[in-house]
Amino acid sequence: MLRHSNHIELWSLGTSQKVDNNYTGLVDLQEEPKKLLVLHKTVTDQDDVKEREGISCCCISNNGKWIMYSTNLGSRLFKLERDADNLTLDKIEFEKNKVPCILGTFTSNSSQLITCPNSGGLNVHDLKDGEVVLRQTIEIKEIEDTIMFLQMSPCGKYLLVGDSSSNIVIWTSKNKQWVPYCKLPKYRYPATAMSIHPKTLYLVVSYSDSKIVEYDVKKRQYTPFTEKLSKLDFKSKFYPIKSITFDPRVNSIIIFHDDSSIYVINKEKAFVDKRKKAKITKDTSPQKAVNGIDVPVTKVEVNTLKKYKHLVHFEWLSKDEMVAVEVNPLALFEKLPPAFAQTTFGNK
């Protein structure tokens, strides 16, 4: 599913031809991608001119049967049925559908829809065959600012919520209700991306100053690898990290990207940089410290792939497939409004 400024497109991906395992080039398509449907909401302005309303958020369930998107006028929920070449789309009415949302997500088993209204908090809806029931309304006191992140763990047990003031709160499902679980230590810079590992349940968070941390959700503490992540040295890095994903085949690999590059970290390939040494200090009093022993610094190897200009999305689709979405810079200028004309001293 692709979200544009004023509409949503649902595509079925194409299939590639079979190649040898040692092949390292572009693979020709055996079946082309196919656009299944386009969703949008048309409104009429004061001059009776019809136009499409902007899309603020959208999400699709893992089983592909539920689609939700929101505009400034409210949220819309659809149930999708596909049989061979036939596609059926039914609009489902639900409580709070007139409340616009800034974020939304489905649980891993596609049984619940969780939305974040503009007014704050969370609304949890139970999804049944043809009925949607409001299960729970959550007020999150730990969130101080606009919610920027709303993610569900792959196991479906944990719900991650983060705001623009670096507050990250985790909720857990208990007796069909979401209850507070823990809160990460607040950092002085806002988070730009976060993702939870599907197997280890390690939460990886990146901040606007390029700091990266790894948090063990089960133990509610940072992992020892966080100290090594804090020593990452990105050369010629000018953009914040946009998203984080993991290799489903290897638990030790972390993949994240910014506007122009993809970075791959293998946690098992940390090395000792003997050229750089950290000095251990021993506190003898609250005001005084003496120099200790110089020890080599353990660093993490980062493999960088630079072949993109404006990379907006990157993630794994299946065991051996991943998708990268790149935006053409010329397309950005085409959507900008015309330049503002101003007359100064008789000249325009």
Language-model features, listed with the residues they occupy:
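Long, low-complexity intrinsically disordered regions enriched in Ser/Thr/Pro/Gly
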Residues: 1-348
